[in-house]
Amino acid sequence: PLRLVGSEMCIRDSNQLVVRDMVSSQSLSSLLSTLLYILGFTLAIEAAGMGIIFLGIHGTMDMTVREELAFSAFHSISAFCNAGFSTLPGNLGNEMVMHGHNTIYITISFLIILGGIGFPILVNLYETVTYEVKRIWHHYIKGNKRMRRKIHLYNLNTRIVLIMTAILLIVGTVVIVVLEWNNAFAGMSPTDKWVQAFFNATCPRTAGFSSVG
């Protein structure tokens, strides 16, 4: 019985630690507020993505403003959730977006990346950026020299994920450019080719986004 109790306690403690790591909360008693924080964080990123996509397509795709907003919201959510669904025939290889809409491809690519690296990594990045902004503000704007830079801003998990993500994206982009420069990307400008290569190097994270065959 004691062994069973001990095992149950170990499992329970282990599960609590896993949940705490997943929601990046210092106390499980604040789970609800943490989940609301995650929801708000997610909606903020998706709203930013929606806004950028909307600005990129506004007045260029023969849609009403309502349709443009719906298109932007759907693709922002689909990208951040790594769903990969598109409302366009032919996915994002549709002629309506293939030319002159690099902003869409870049925005969707970064939404895919942010949605794929995980919430704890996003929080660590957010905290790091926030700290650096405050440090620069106090050091250079207000002239307060006492606020020193923290040595360990990124935790080990964040470093590993970011490094591996960068390596995979860089290698994937270069390989796709080399293989498809005069094939699937024939007729495109050099800028379009690099954007399409980056987008298609990012897309394997999702279930369905594509722009070339």
Map each language-model feature to its residues.
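Membrane-proximal intracellular helices of multi-pass ion channels
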Residues: 3, 7-213
